[in-house]
Amino acid sequence: MTEEPHAIEITLDRLLLERHMTLAELAERVGVAYPNLSILKNNRARAVRFSTLTRLCEALECQPGDLLRLRER
């Protein structure tokens, strides 16, 4: 049985661009490994911890809704 992909997208690339910040800078600020943030940025993550989401929002000065969006199916 194959699992259907989720419909949540991470808009990290847009937020980084708007804030003139690199993924490496964000990784350092939030204390998450660069490869893990890359997986998240490229929408390959299957889950995100609330603690990680909180740190991302704090570093990017945004709300969770700014980072997540529902993809149209």
Where do the PLM segments sit?
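Short, basic-rich loop-to-helix N-cap that marks the start of a DNA-contacting helix
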Residues: 44-55
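Short alpha-helical DNA-recognition segment
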Residues: 21-39
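Alpha-helical residues within the helix-turn-helix
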Residues: 17, 28, 58
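Short C-terminal boundary/hinge segments that cap the last helix of small helical domains
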Residues: 61-73
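DNA major-groove recognition helix of helix-turn-helix
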Residues: 41, 52, 71
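A short, Lys/Arg-rich alpha-helix, primarily the initiator
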Residues: 1-21
